[in-house]
């Protein structure tokens, strides 16, 4: 985590002191190098605690245990893929108006310029590259690493803000459809500020109840209390609002479709995967470490949230006509599926959620990476489903890869999604949540319809006369898509090594 923070600060210094022409290479090298070094550090720490559940660190505000390390490793792997997509700077084909037809640079050359203004067109013609996105991404990654490892609520809130603030900025930096991007950033910021306020108010209530912000101290206070727990339950509910907002669970999901659609697609890919991983890690730690004694009170609430999330996500996705919005509602539905593992409240439930987050993170990055390649003649992303007709016929490789990710989301056998859903449903069934499993299976069947609909559209429908083009990416995006597709297939065919790793990380430090 300190490696990532150091890289983020160094990235800010690069922006301040390095010539513009040298920044891109320096920022990319620094971001990738720091992320890979952080992965190596996680591996070293894991090897140093063979028979140990975990230990506190940083004066007890952070805990280093196996679930935290698993989640941090997953976030860092997803971050590497996200940085590859964010770094894509495919050379555009110049057009008469200074546009970038065929180019894959997702970020505006001058964020402060009014969309469509002369200043923006001049910056585009000059080939100005937005390199501030790299330190912003690294700050977001640092917050994500801290969020699931925080051992007190104040540290958790700080992590929440550190991961959120850079994402608010990144969402508003799209090169094309600037107004839509800025609208998405504003919505995300306003709703995110409200959710953070709810979280902080809940922290204050739990502090008033327990007299401590430490998660284990809160657990001890609840266990020793023989009176009313209404203050603790109210605080828990408010904290739950803040965390469920980040995972995109209903009814706190309204920001997801607009933000996923308006944000630059590489940012959407990174945010959709990494934020969900970090937020679910924090949710698990809160309920499994601080509030296990209140399980009879919070489980019914999560039951309702999980069912509502699965229903809203799947039913609304069926009606979508935009690929990015369809994937956004798919992400909402997957939050409901993951919540079934959280509700299990047992060690298989924890390990199944860890596996699901790993598999889902890779598939999500890959799916959005493919979306970023489909462009019209002016270089705009083509996300209307009708424009994807015949895409698989014209480019079988791209169609096949995107179909693989959709089949994984649907939970089809021999993909990572099947193993993920089977694991969480099995754990929920063992935890007594059979009705929830039934709802999950039905929701998965409904979800399969809109995934297969896109596959049929790509391979069995005639393309339009002015069909969109597939932009050939550089090695950065190609590497990201290749790795995510390989992992999606590998976890479907040979999931046991990762399942064993997740089973070894199925216990928090209490």
Regions found by a protein language model. Name each.
Residues 1-510:
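Alpha-helical transmembrane segments of multi-pass membrane proteins predominantly involved
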């Amino acid at each position: 985590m300190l490696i990532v923070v150091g890289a983020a600060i160094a990235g800010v210094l690069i922006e301040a002191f390095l010539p513009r022409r040298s920044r891109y290479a320096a920022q990319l090298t620094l971001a990738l190098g720091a992320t890979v070094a952080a992965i190596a550090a996680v591996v070293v720490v894991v090897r140093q605690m063979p028979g140990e559940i975990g230990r506190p660190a940083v004066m007890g505000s952070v805990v280093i245990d196996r679930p935290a390390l698993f989640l941090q490793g997953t976030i860092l792997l997803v971050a590497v893929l996200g940085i590859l997509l964010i770094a894509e700077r495919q050379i555009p084909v110049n057009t008469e108006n200074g546009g970038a037809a065929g180019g894959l640079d997702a970020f505006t050359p001058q964020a402060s310029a009014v969309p469509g203004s002369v200043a923006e067109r001049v910056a585009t013609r000059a080939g100005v590259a937005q390199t501030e996105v790299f330190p912003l991404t690294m700050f977001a990654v640092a917050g994500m690493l801290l969020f699931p490892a925080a051992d007190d609520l104040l540290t958790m809130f700080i992590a929440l803000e550190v991961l959120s603030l850079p994402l608010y900025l990144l969402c508003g930096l799209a090169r094309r459809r600037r107004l839509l991007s800025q609208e998405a950033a504003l919505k995300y910021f306003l709703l995110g500020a409200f959710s953070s306020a709810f979280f902080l108010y809940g922290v204050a209530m739990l502090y008033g109840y327990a007299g401590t912000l430490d998660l284990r101290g809160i657990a001890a206070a609840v266990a020793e209390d023989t009176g009313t727990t209404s203050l603790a339950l109210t605080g828990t509910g408010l904290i739950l609002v803040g965390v469920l907002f980040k995972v995109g669970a209903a009814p706190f999901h309204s920001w997801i479709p607009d933000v996923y659609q308006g944000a630059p697609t590489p940012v959407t890919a990174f945010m959709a995967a990494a934020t969900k991983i970090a937020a679910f890690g924090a949710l698990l730690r809160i309920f499994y470490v601080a509030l296990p004694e209140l399980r009879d009170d919070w489980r019914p609430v999560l039951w309702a949230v999980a069912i509502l999330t699965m229903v809203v996500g799947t039913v609304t996705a069926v009606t979508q006509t935009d690929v990015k919005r369809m994937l956004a509602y798919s992400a909402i539905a997957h939050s409901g599926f993951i919540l079934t593992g959280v509700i299990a409240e047992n060690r298989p439930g924890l390990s199944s959620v860890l596996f699901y987050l790993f598999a889902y993170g890779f598939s999500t990055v890959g799916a959005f990476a493919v979306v970023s390649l489909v462009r019209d003649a002016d270089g705009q992303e083509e996300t209307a489903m009708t424009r994807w007709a015949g895409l698989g016929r014209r480019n079988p490789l791209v169609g096949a890869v995107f179909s693989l990710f959709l089949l994984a989301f649907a939970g089809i056998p021999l993909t990572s999604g099947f193993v993920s859903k089977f694991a969480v449903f099995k754990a929920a069934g063992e935890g007594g949540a059979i009705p929830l499993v039934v709802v999950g299976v039905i929701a998965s069947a409904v979800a399969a319809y809109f995934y297969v609909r896109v596959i049929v559209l790509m391979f069995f429908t005639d393309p339009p006369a002015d069909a969109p083009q597939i932009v050939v990416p550089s090695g950065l995006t190609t590497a990201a898509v290749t790795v995510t597709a390989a992992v999606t297939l590998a976890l479907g065919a040979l999931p046991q090594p990762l399942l064993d790793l997740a089973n070894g990380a199925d216990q928090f430090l209490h």
